[in-house]
């Protein structure tokens, strides 16, 4: 599909809203998860989610940014869980409508979180990956940023002000508290137990770490530890 590009080599793709034919093309290429960032009210969009087995919708207003940062971080974690749980040859496709701003914003935050790099570096990578699409050659998109200024500012500030930080040094650490950190994982734990398929993926991802089959981000490692710790504590409490 010439309107898309990889953001995780051979595993994760981002691009524009797919037509029915492109959905079939993506499935043939190994895509097993579709992540949709569009809203229900958007015009000239042909719904496809009933044609695919696995579909997640996290709507962001066209040209806008996520309104709830905690829910957005939960969503980023869900995307990482899906990518981490992909089998050989399997892929995930994340898209907005045009495949530029909203998807670029999500991928920039995703890369900063999973690779432990600065927002500046993640934005550069998104611009690089975005410019490599065949349909953008010799167009303004080959040179310009896929994100608008508001979306770029969101990425730049997201990790500097949010209570849960990645491995790089955030600009503002005053908002970070241990109690906030624990409370965040409590909420994520509850949410994952409401989504058994994702819960199984995050627990099984521990096998990848043991086998050395690829890096798992610090945040995902901490979450897995918290879930297992809470399960073990319940067993101890029941037996005591």
Curated annotation (Swiss-Prot):
Active-site residue list: 96 (phosphocysteine intermediate)
Record EC number: 3.1.3.48
InterPro entries reported in the protein's UniProt record: Prot-tyrosine_phosphatase-like (IPR029021), PTP-SAK (IPR057023), Tyr_Pase_AS (IPR016130), Tyr_Pase_dom (IPR000387), TYR_PHOSPHATASE_DUAL_dom (IPR020422)
Key words of the record: Hydrolase, Protein phosphatase
Catalytic activity: O-phospho-L-tyrosyl-[protein] + H2O = L-tyrosyl-[protein] + phosphate
Key word Hydrolase present: yes
Molecular function, one GO term: protein tyrosine phosphatase activity
Transmembrane segments: none
UniProt xrefs under Gene3D superfamilies: Protein tyrosine phosphatase superfamily
Ranges where the Tyrosine-protein phosphatase domain occurs: 3-151
UniProt keyword Transferase present: no
Family recorded in the similarity comment: Belongs to the protein-tyrosine phosphatase family.
Protein name as catalogued: Putative tyrosine phosphatase 067L
Organism field: Invertebrate iridescent virus 3 (IIV-3)
């Amino acid at each position: 599909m010439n309107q898309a590009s990889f953001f995780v080599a051979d595993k994760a793709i981002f691009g524009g809203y797919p037509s029915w034919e492109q959905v079939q093309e993506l499935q043939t290429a190994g895509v097993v998860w579709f992540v949709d960032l569009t809203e229900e009210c958007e015009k000239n969009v042909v719904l496809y989610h009933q044609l695919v087995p696995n579909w997640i919708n996290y709507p962001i207003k066209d040209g806008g940014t996520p309104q709830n940062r905690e829910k957005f971080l939960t969503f980023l974690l869900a995307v990482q869980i899906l990518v981490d749980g992909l089998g050989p040859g399997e892929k995930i496709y994340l898209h907005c409508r045009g495949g530029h701003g909203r998807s670029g914003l999500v991928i920039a935050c995703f890369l900063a979180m999973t690779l432990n790099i600065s927002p500046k570096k993640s934005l550069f990578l998104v611009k690089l990956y975005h410019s490599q699409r065949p349909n953008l050659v010799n167009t303004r998109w080959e040179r310009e940023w896929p994100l608008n200024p508001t979306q770029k500012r969101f990425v730049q500030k997201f990790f500097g002000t949010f209570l849960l930080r990645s491995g790089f040094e955030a600009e503002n650490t005053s908002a970070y508290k241990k109690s906030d950190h624990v409370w965040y994982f409590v909420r994520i734990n509850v949410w994952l137990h409401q989504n058994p398929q994702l819960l199984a993926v995050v627990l099984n991802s521990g096998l990848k770490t043991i086998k050395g089959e690829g890096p798992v981000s610090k945040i995902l490692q901490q979450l897995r530890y918290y879930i297992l710790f809470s399960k073990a504590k319940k067993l101890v409490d029941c037996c005591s």
